[in-house]
Design a protein with these regions (language model features):
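Gly/Pro/Ser/Thr-rich low-complexity, intrinsically disordered segments predominantly at protein N-termini
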Residues: 1-125
Length: 126
């Protein structure tokens, strides 16, 4: 899953990966996505937040980079920001909510690491 050669954070931030990947202390980590069930659920959840964005005071984004620590960047399936949060290209303040849609290939330890990163950053809801 992770590459063996260390990649500088500046290189990660200057490149576009298709699909986007996480950056963990110099290593790129691929994410499990692209299957019909995963994409369908991601779209439905994003749609719920998008339709209610005005009433709830939120903005939802699919696959947005979040800097969870100095050398750690995660790309949740859906990030929900408060309307008042900064609108920077990379999120550096704790979002209101990070959603990870699980795929059959996802493993408990890897998910616990992702969720732990969000909680340590200060995300209240995962």
């Amino acid at each position: 899953m992770a590459t063996s050669a260390l990649i500088p954070v500046s290189e990660y931030l200057s490149k576009v990966y298709e699909p986007d990947c996480d950056y963990i202390e110099g290593h790129l980590e691929e994410r499990n996505l692209g299957e019909l069930g995963h994409s369908s659920l991601q779209g439905i959840l994003w749609g719920i937040f998008h339709v209610n964005r005005g009433a709830w005071g939120v903005l939802a984004y699919p696959e947005l980079r979040i800097q969870v620590a100095a050398e750690r960047y995660r790309v949740p399936d859906i990030t929900v920001l408060r309307r008042s949060d900064p609108k920077d290209p990379i999120v550096r303040v704790p979002p209101l909510l990070c959603i990870e849609v699980l795929s059959p290939e996802d493993r408990m330890q890897r998910m616990q690491e992702r969720i732990g990163d969000y909680f340590r950053m200060g995300v209240a809801h995962v």
